[in-house]
Amino acid sequence: MKPFLRHTLDRQLLRLHELDALLSASDVVSDLDRFRALTREHAEASVVAEQYNRLTAREADLASAESMLAEAKNDPDMAEMAEEEINAAKTDIAQLDEALQLMLIPKDPDDRRAAFIEIRAGTGGDESALFAGDLFRLYTRFAERKRWQVEIISESPSELGGYKEVVLRIDGPTDAMGVGVYGKLRFESGGHRVQRVPATETQGRIHTSACTVAVLPEPDETVAIQINPADLRIDTYRASGAGGQHINKTDSAVRITHLPTGIVAECQEGRSQHGNKAQAMKVLTARIHEKERSAQAAKDAAMRKGLIGSGDRSDRIRTYNFPQGRLTDHRINLTLYKLLTIMEGDLDDVVTALQVARGAEQLNELETANNGG
């Protein structure tokens, strides 16, 4: 393990002792929000401390076994036993080292959150809209595999199938590392290019078209309050498309415009105007915050060009080549020849590879910061 990681872990142990003291302080106990935040931090720090203690214990076992081996020159049985313990300890240490590195990667608080996924058809006309429908199915089937909940917020179907635009909300529990839907899918943001022979193509020529995907974290309920109601224009209209006649009899669809930025969000899927307004407000808030995040990411990118990129939807991140059965993620040079399986929702290999690549980036950044730049 690199020295800077061990120093970071030592600081984590000190922080755990601080948290023990803070959580028993009367002023903290009486402040519910602070108490909850510190309790969550304590739980995460405890997991790290437990793993670190296991690591140091196995390192001690390794040192002891190596001493035993050095002293067992004339005792083959003892030497064999020592070698077995050395091999077992080294295996455990490598696994614990890797797990601790993942735990030390700085956490984005938004990774725990639900996500809005916006899929928009781009260049390629009808074929692009059909591919937007394919991406919609990919993400919904991936969500089904994870037992996540999927909700359509708004949709604009195309005439030949697929979507001109569709917005989903996906929610589900966090994993053991505290990563939720947004943390899993955040790296899907960007330009997705498809190469295939359209069903309407009689000459068998391969066409290229594209869609854009934006993945936004659902904002905290308290954040939405910070938007000035005077800055909003709220319009109601009759829903079209999905929803049926029952919705079309009333002006239940809602469109909200944030006047200072011109950002618009709408929802027409619910049966009540109140419910649609609440969902549209969540999407609007997420888009406003994403604009702020993108501006900050652009500033950061000017100083450091990350491998994964800023998540800007103009970045071409991936190519889906159907004739070759190939998916290529250009950010990390990942190529998989199981495109049809992936399009049925088997996205885990892609998601994991992107998370590992980003984790390696963050560890390098952490090391640079610890070394004083």
From Swiss-Prot:
Keyword Transferase attributed: no
Modified residues (N5-methylglutamine): 245
Cellular localisation: Cytoplasm
Cellular compartments per GO CC: cytoplasm
Keywords on record: Cytoplasm, Methylation, Protein biosynthesis
Tree of life domain: Bacteria
GO molecular function annotations of the record: translation release factor activity, codon specific
PROSITE patterns found in the cross-reference section: RF_PROK_I (PS00745)
PTM section of the record: Methylated by PrmC. Methylation increases the termination efficiency of RF1.
Similarity field: Belongs to the prokaryotic/mitochondrial release factor family.
PANTHER family, A to Z: LD18447P (PTHR43804:SF7)
Known function: Peptide chain release factor 1 directs the termination of translation in response to the peptide chain termination codons UAG and UAA.
Name of the protein: Peptide chain release factor 1
Gene name for this UniProt entry: prfA
